[in-house]
Amino acid sequence: LQEKVNAFEVTQARALIEGEVAAIAATTINEEELARLHQTLVDMENSQFIAAADKEFHQIIANSTRNNAMILSVENLWKLRSSTPEIIEDYDSVCSKDNSKTLSEHRAIYQALKSGDATQARNAMHSHFNRLINALFDAVETRALDEIKRKNDEKRGLYSIPDTSSNIR
């Protein structure tokens, strides 16, 4: 079953589950967890730590719910995200591009959690994943167009008539 799961399914599941996780966390997160969450934002500004800080950000939020089923759900979705080659490739193609959007979205989630606003936290998390889903669609579309261009270039070479006008005197 794991091989049949794609990046869109994982991302949709993450959006739905982590949206609710964020809503719960807005009412349960403590000061120490908020401080650790803030540190992940600082770490994300350093390109060396983006992936690790991103994962930690989401884990801290899940852990702050104190709900083991939610924590396990988030952990399992991260395992799917990082253990299926196709999903890894799809995520890498969009997550490595522009960190500023992810950082901005994480800041919005952090602010909602800090203010204790469950609705705002859910909405901020949904916005974060909606952008990711759209970026995944853009990446898949670009790959498909590149493949079409590659195939057309092969055919162009196969069917084009060579220009012989320079050989005529």
Where are these regions (language model features)?
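Short linear motifs at protein or domain termini
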Residues: 1-17, 23, 27, 158-169
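Conserved amphipathic alpha-helical segments that form helical-bundle/coiled-coil interaction surfaces
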Residues: 10-88, 104-106, 110, 120-135, ...
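Short helix-coil transition/hinge motifs at the ends and kinks of transmembrane helices
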Residues: 1, 90-97
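Short helix-capping and inter-helix turn/linker motifs at the boundaries of alpha-helical repeat units
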Residues: 99-101
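C-terminal effector-binding regulatory domain of bacterial HTH transcription factors
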Residues: 118-169
